[in-house]
Regions:
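Hydrophobic transmembrane alpha-helices and their helix-loop junctions in integral membrane proteins
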Residues: 2-47, 56-253
Length: 253
């Protein structure tokens, strides 16, 4: 995507403004670094830090064109994803108060009620970042961003943050996740799937159609991860495999 941008942001592309390329690459490269940091972080505090950085970079990239519509879409994405981050703040605070550490592996030592709070917060944050109901509204509007941004951030990378932190929490719990989280995850994934499919029909803009496609594909991953809470390891492995499948396929668009 970065290499493609070097051709996309040129005078040869008549439909694209030719100013602000330094700003574009700065936000894009910081975002890539933040994604690497989030994936490699072994603490929920580290995840929270990089979670917020990706949100800020997304705001800068969605609003790159500086039009009224793109700036409004950028602010919408920033607000919704930051409201979702409240769940991660809650989970981090609860984990630290209960165990004295931010290490994700400490989740396995929590009692059932505390674990429910931590997983509830993580799941809420994951819904916001991965554009699941009721926090899905920002993603279709985020397609105001330049096409390389839509391909990388909002189809292949940023939207995977939510499913990643949820999957990482499930792994850290050593298979002991409250079943209520599984039922809530399954229910919301199915509702998002149905709603997303219905929203395919009225779309006339291809990028918005792809955004709704991303939302429903992420619902499949949430559905698989939620089912895995009840025992089937194949569901977890299938969900993880589908993260890569969707990222490669959607980036082609």
């Amino acid at each position: 995507v970065s290499l493609y941008s070097t051709g996309y942001l040129t005078d040869g592309n008549r439909e694209h403004p030719h100013e602000g390329t330094r700003r574009y690459y700065a936000f894009l490269l910081i975002f890539i670094g933040a994604m690497a940091g989030l994936v490699l972080s072994s603490t929920i505090l580290g995840q929270l830090l990089f979670f917020e950085i990706t949100g800020g970079c997304s705001w800068g990239l969605i609003g790159y064109y500086q039009s009224e519509k793109s700036l409004r879409s950028a602010m919408k994405a920033l607000l919704i994803t930051h409201v979702a981050s409240i769940g991660l703040y809650l989970a981090a605070a609860t984990l630290f108060v209960s165990t004295g550490t931010f290490e994700l592996t400490a989740i396995a030592t929590l009692d059932e009620p505390t674990k429910l709070i931590v997983f509830g917060g993580i799941l809420f944050a994951a819904w916001g970042k991965s554009a699941q109901l009721p926090l899905q509204a920002w993603l279709p509007d985020a397609m105001e961003a330049p096409t390389p941004v839509s391909a990388y951030l909002h189809a292949a990378s940023m939207v995977k943050v939510g499913v990643y932190i949820f999957a990482r929490a499930i792994m850290s719990a050593d298979g002991d996740v409250p079943h209520l989280i599984g039922w809530v995850g399954i229910t919301m994934a199915v509702i998002t799937l149905i709603y997303g499919f219905m929203m395919y029909l009225p779309q006339k803009d291809m990028k918005r159609l792809l955004a709704w496609s991303t939302i429903t594909q992420l619902s499949y991953i949430f559905l698989a991860l939620s089912i895995s809470i009840f025992g089937p390891r194949e569901a977890f492995e299938g969900g993880i495999a589908y993260i890569f499948n969707h990222a490669f396929a959607k980036s082609l668009f």
